[in-house]
């Protein structure tokens, strides 16, 4: 059975679940047109997540996907790294007040419980791996399960616990990289290489993500061995996307002017590798990218939250 039939899709397109950018309206629109609409919910409180699921169910009778970020209770509850001096100084220079939360991230366990209590057609996971028991519990509720991998070893690990598919995310992808093994950060692979090497070690159905914007690119990933294309950036400037108009205009400008379209892979926003447009913040503080004491995710993410909100 192909993923098109497994997920009951008309088109081989998955709208990427970009936390902070996707909305129930965007996901429902994509699903209603025959793709797999997705809602990035890793930063969504459990009660709001439940409301979003109910909204999606009211807007579409087609399959849709909820994506969560896998974090241990310790990581989501620990904020013990000192704020870097350069970041504190930047807040002061910009006259922005930093208000650190009591915990740097929401409880993954509580978010996952929402998916048990209010089952969804498809659930995907990033930043880590769940257990085989959790996969089976979701599948017993009728939920299809997708893992995320930046390295073949991660894809193989997902396959071994019984998921329905794995989204392999090449280094070209915008936003956060979803892998968790050291190899995925130390040896970033281009998408076609990642598909090829993953295909050599597992026959799990693959969804490809990373720099896909055209039908020709979709053909290329299908030829390489993936079945569906997960596309994010192309949806960011749509009416139902949740980012503000300034960000949307920056993306539109970048599509017209190569001088403003340079991207960079960085840990400076969240502590975890993510690709974004090169801006003054990255230019000014790129020298701190590889310092050994850069706070990890999600701690640095909490430290830069007010800065990103101000921007």
Locate each region found by the language model.
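Active-site entrance/lid segments in N-terminal catalytic domains of soluble metabolic enzymes
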Residues: 1-201
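Conserved active-site-proximal phosphate/metal-binding subdomains
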Residues: 176-207, 212-311
